[in-house]
Design a protein with these regions (language model features):
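Residue-level signal for secondary-structure boundary sites
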Residues: 13-15, 43, 79-81, 113
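Short acidic, glycine-rich loop/turn motifs
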Residues: 9, 37-43, 116-118, 177-179
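Intrinsically disordered, low-complexity segments enriched in serine, threonine, and glycine
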Residues: 81-194
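Oligomerization/assembly interface segments of phage tail-like spikes and tubes
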Residues: 1-14, 64-79, 173
Length: 194
């Protein structure tokens, strides 16, 4: 996916040249940033983007208080995401979107268990603290800590047991989540206009 943004950079609170440099420095050709659309109803759409191209830098800011700029961006996943939806306990989840959502469990580390819509039941022994269990198919229940580091010891207890779960959008799916577990679901869209 690619697109462009046309913006007005203003000198509110700081010199225009400083504001413009700060705006441009926020973009990278190699390090993805988040482009976020906030709707009037409070919902959001996000996409990770990198800089594809930008207008040439102005030769002078003298006497200017506002300047138009255009940024061209690219995304390599082809997916917009909605805001995180959280669930606890025994719940029926219906997720909007065009594609299966991203799902993970936030686990506070206590001994507990859960049952997925596929019927798979998993018991968790007491763990080392708050962890996230990736429920996406192919991630095989990868366990990470709050900093995103893989917890290989805890993950090894799930290997061969948990291969992941795929939910289809707009279908009802029942989860049984034990104490200390929170399901985090992120809808995926092909367009931000959903």
């Amino acid at each position: 996916i690619s697109g462009s943004l046309k913006v007005l950079v203003t000198d509110d609170g700081e010199d225009l040249s400083v504001a413009f440099r700060r705006w441009r420095a926020a973009w990278s050709y190699t390090r993805p940033g988040k482009l976020k659309v906030e709707w009037r109803d409070g919902h959001t759409s996000e996409i990770e983007v990198v800089l594809a191209d930008a207008d040439p830098l102005p030769s002078s800011f003298v006497g200017l208080h506002v300047m138009e700029d255009q940024i061209k961006w690219e995304n390599f996943s082809g997916v917009w995401t909605g805001g995180v939806r959280t669930y606890t306990g025994n719940v029926t989840v219906t997720v909007p979107g065009d594609l299966p959502p991203k799902m993970r469990l936030r686990w506070d580390g206590r001994s507990t268990g859960f049952t997925l819509p596929s019927g798979l039941s998993v018991s968790l022994a007491q763990g080392p603290g708050t962890r996230w269990i990736d429920l996406e198919r192919g991630m095989q229940g990868q366990v990470t800590d709050a900093n995103g580091n893989v917890d290989s010891g805890t993950w090894s207890s799930l290997r061969g047991v948990l291969v992941g779960e795929t939910l289809q959008p707009h279908t009802k799916n029942s989860f049984q989540l034990g104490a200390g577990l929170t399901l985090e679901v992120v809808p995926r869209y092909l367009s931000p206009w959903r």
